[in-house]
Amino acid sequence: MSAAPRSNKMAIIMSCFAAFGGFLYGYDTGNISGVKEMPYFQRQMGNLQPDGTYALSSGDNSLITSILSAGTFVGALCASPLGNTLGRRFGIIAGLVLFCIGVGLQTGGKDLAIFVVGRVFAGLGVGVTSCLVPMYQSECAPKHIRGMIVGAYQWMITIGLLIAAIVVDQTKDRNDLGSYAIPIGVQFAWAIILAGGLVLLPESPRWLISVGKDEKAQVALARILGVAPDSPVVAEEYAEIAAQIHHTRSLGSTSYLDCFKSTNRNRLRTFTGLGIQALQQLSGINFIFYYGTQFFKNAGLENPFVITIATNVVNVGMTVPGLLLVDRMGRRPLLLIGAAGMFVCHFIVAGVGSGVSTDNQAGQNTLIAFVIFFIAFFAATWGPLAWVVTGEIYPTATRGKQMSMSTASNWLWNFGIGYATPYLVDKAPGSAGLQSRVFFIWGGACVLCFLFTFFFVPETKGLSLEQVDILYRKSSILGSNKVRKEILANNVFDDDKEAYKSAKTEAQTEHKEDVKMRDL
């Protein structure tokens, strides 16, 4: 009897819809750069200057930007217990509730203290969703397009950044609270849309199996695969997932401490996740999106808001080639190409910016061009692929804990870079005054990106999450592509898979016989 044909339609719909969580991340990140430069916001939150204008101090500037990342760091760590207890879907919804509290405080807050508290709550929510959304996607996506689907999370981040820049540009000249309350308050709508959709989508079958809800897992698998619950396709998928979870648990406990043990190469996996998320931040991308408006303004550009929108358009557009190539070229080649390209762009920007005056139009055009080239390289490679890699390298039994730590690493470095950048760039007393020379730092970090990818990131293209686990057990990093091909060619899976598959088939047969007996 041939297996019933499967459909990827539901898996693609649910995974792509969940990617809308990235829109919240991107929009919230993108609006703050412009909001801080609004004249009304500076009068409301800033300090009176000797020339009669208002401005935020370097300390307040750093606090407003980086405090969100402090909240997201804590939120990401809380995502594991939330996601493991409530499930992936309702864990995300819990994060959205925290996010909405933060949006409300920022929208209504008329002094800096309330605004900052609102940023903390919003950060908690973004931290939870930024961990659980890629996890939910990776656990539900078909393996042959998993890279593209999880990468769509980053694409939605870029779209959020772009929409935020456009909205801020439209309200920046208002002389009332609406100048910043409108671009911040509209985030209520994004959260409601995502929460409403998640209620209707199936839960992650891998989470359901991990907590012993096998029947619900089979129903969820059937919805995702577009087949009946008693289909052989469901039995096949269920057996592979259950066997991998059984193997992981047979090795011992699944505590946070176990994430750093050599068993099942968990230490290497945890280090890889922590490292790739840290290096994504150290690439310098959020310097552009947190301080881009101010940087372009200092470079002598008449309308830095327009350039900010242009950089966001490039970010959105160039993420698409990355999504199309990740499941064709693979993870490692794209990450290596991206690191090399970003390195070149950073050193050109640093050299031009530090060697050419702001009055030199050709020099400033070159600076802008290579900032845009840098964004293009990042958007097509390290932007989406950091989430793809961390979403697929962990075993199911400890995925929540390891994913929360890697996401927390992203936000910890985000916080550090966000807080330190004004002191690195500004010429104010007590600051380093590096200005464009800060790009030498980002360029040096991109050398680390290249080396880290070469020695620590395996090639996982085309493998199921369970086969990725087998890859780690059977292969070195440098030999991962060869072993990956062997796993695919020989359809390698855990030894326990057939036992789980047989047990499920027998249970279904007994159930059908019971039904027939009752009918008699």
Q: Residues of each region from the PLM?
A:
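Alpha-helical transmembrane bundle of multi-pass membrane proteins
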Residues: 1-225, 229, 239, 243-520
